[in-house]
Amino acid sequence: MQSLTTALENLLRHLSQEIPATPGIRVIDIPFPLKDAFDALSWLASQQTYPQFYWQQRNGDEEAVVLGAITRFTSLDQAQRFLRQHPEHADLRIWGLNAFDPSQGNLLLPRLEWRRCGGKATLRLTLFSESSLQHDAIQAKEFIATLVSIKPLPGLHLTTTREQHWPDKTGWTQLIELATKTIAEGELDKVVLARATDLHFASPVNAAAMMAASRRLNLNCYHFYMAFDGENAFLGSSPERLWRRRDKALRTEALAGTVANNPDDKQAQQLGEWLMADDKNQRENMLVVEDICQRLQADTQTLDVLPPQVLRLRKVQHLRRCIWTSLNKADDVICLHQLQPTAAVAGLPRDLARQFIARHEPFTREWYAGSAGYLSLQQSEFCVSLRSAKISGNVVRLYAGAGIVRGSDPEQEWQEIDNKAAGLRTLLQME
């Protein structure tokens, strides 16, 4: 770990230079040579400082770990206001989670950020103070002194003691029947209903080890992990982008419509072809496309909807249509509140679907079906926090949802959420 040691020594040298006793922000970037095999997630999980946040873009080109919070924000609106107060730092990134309710968030300006973009990496330390940067530099030195060497992540040697679904299968059937009745009566076009599964284990679950296992096997996904403290974390491997913004250029997508995957390429292709031709799944996907376009229309230029694709994952395949446009102004608050929750995770009409979910789902979604990522003045990117799990000591809560439209069958939808949950669940049964 020569690169890390050298980078930290360079940071300390910068902190030993004269720093003014004035308010403000100072960013120290140290080039980080990728000469040795540095596993950023393992290093992050070795530390005893919280919060910890890990994020990897789904094509693998960008990866980041952030450690410690200089300042925290309970909503993306707050975070964007902060960034706009410091326009000289266009690349200053705030990382974290937005809840299913987009007015709630857990976002942070990190003390330390390691970021890899393609073949280049940087270690960044940020100072921020409303009174004295000099004083914050002293705290930053103390922070660096707490860092420890990397330790290998443990295996997931787990014994299940209990399992509970919310709702159970009977409750699920009743819920789907109520939803399809409501749709038939014209009150809703679609509602996305979810199930939470609590898996109890004989010993605590190492959340970072679970994240590492998922990253290894669940390809073509965003990977995200937030450890709130030593026992509580939220993580996932999501196939779905909520949005990516580069200045005013915006990319989003409709990911809706699902069929099982198969390890055999030929059988997987046949399933994918069936998905492309299936009326129910195409209808479900187009509902999401139309809703996204309608929501963005007032804040964007021309909206381009690309042809449908089949996205093949480890356990399932999805229909995806990408949507590209240009914003009238670079504003992540607009992106969040217009796009989240999309019809792919809530339903249509959105407000009525959210009311149905709040009234009838037997658990609170919290971070599930929210979003994970970062914002800066320059750019931003968030994935939808799907295929996700909440870890609380020795309990793992897995989440999975299904889009309910006219003609949905409770048994088929139960099988679909089993397939979706399997992306993470099978990791806990492998060793």
From Swiss-Prot:
Biological processes, Gene Ontology terms: menaquinone biosynthetic process
Q: What is the effect of changing K190A?
A: Lack of activity
Function summary: Catalyzes the conversion of chorismate to isochorismate. Can also catalyze the reverse reaction, but with a lower efficiency.
Q: Which gene encodes it?
A: menF
Coiled-coil ranges from the UniProt annotation = none
Q: What is the lineage of its organism?
A: Bacteria, Pseudomonadati, Pseudomonadota, Gammaproteobacteria, Enterobacterales
Q: Which EC class is the enzyme in? A: isomerase
Thermoactivity: Optimum temperature is 37 degrees Celsius. At 60 degrees Celsius the mutase activity is completely lost.
User: What does the entry comment about cofactor binding?
Assistant: Binds more tightly in the presence of chorismate.
| Phenotype for R387A | Lack of activity
Q: What happens when the gene is disrupted?
A: Mutant produces only a trace of menaquinone.
Protein name per Swiss-Prot or TrEMBL: Isochorismate synthase MenF
